[in-house]
Amino acid sequence: MKSLRLIISGRVQGVGYRDWIVAEAREHGVGGWVRNRGTDEVEALLSGDDEAVDAVLAACDRGPLYARVASIVATASEPADEPILRRLPSV
């Protein structure tokens, strides 16, 4: 089991990034949450099998069509309580 907290910055708001990451996570069986943070960041907590979390992390660098990811900071975290990734309100 692996859990990562991600801070993804760049053009990641207003381009469907949160909905895209929810779909990616569900495809790989990864739980947790995702939300907008500030004006140019998305924050996510991913929890699941090591390979599944790594696959979603690798995909995050690509993002949806109009996203332009400038950086991803990933840190180890406590596991998420949510077995299915869900979208939280922005902070």
Briefly describe each language-model feature range.
Residues 1-91:
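Intrinsically disordered, low-complexity, mixed-charge
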